Structures are given as structure tokens and as C-alpha cells.
Amino acid sequence: MPITSKYTNQKIEQIISDVFDVLEKHDASAELALMVVGNIATNIINADVPASKKKEIAEQFSQALLKSTK
């Protein structure tokens, strides 16, 4: 069963494009871009996820990342 999202592909792709534009503006290498994106993910989890769910969300995020890079 495919995963459904409450967000449109268009909205997701636009945000991705905007983030890429910022990274390109700063001439970020792949290493720097991954550091920035990782820090953003950490900041979002720390700011918006209840303490009791942080580990679970981080594990789900890391598993999704691993699956998407195969």
C-alpha cells in the first residue's frame, strides 16, 4: 500500500527547490548541505516533537532516509 501524504507533491517539490536555491546561493558542498539539512532535522525534532516521541521519530526518519537512498 502506498504511503499517502496530506501535502501535495507540488508543495513538497517547491520547498525542496527553495532549499536547494539557498544551498546553491551559499555554494554549499554536499558535505555542508548534509550538515545543514541534518541540523534542520534535529532542530525540528527538538522544537516540535514531544520528548516521549523524539527517539521514535528520529528512528523513523533515519529508516526513511536509508530506504530512499537504495
Curated annotation (Swiss-Prot):
Q: InterPro entries recorded for this chain?
A: UPF0352 (IPR009857), YejL_sf (IPR023202)
Regions crossing the membrane: none
Q: Which domain of life is it from?
A: Bacteria
HAMAP family recorded for this chain?
UPF0352 (MF_00816)
* Family recorded in the similarity comment: Belongs to the UPF0352 family.
NCBIfam families xrefs? PRK13689.1
Name of the protein described by the UniProt record:
UPF0352 protein PBPRA2586
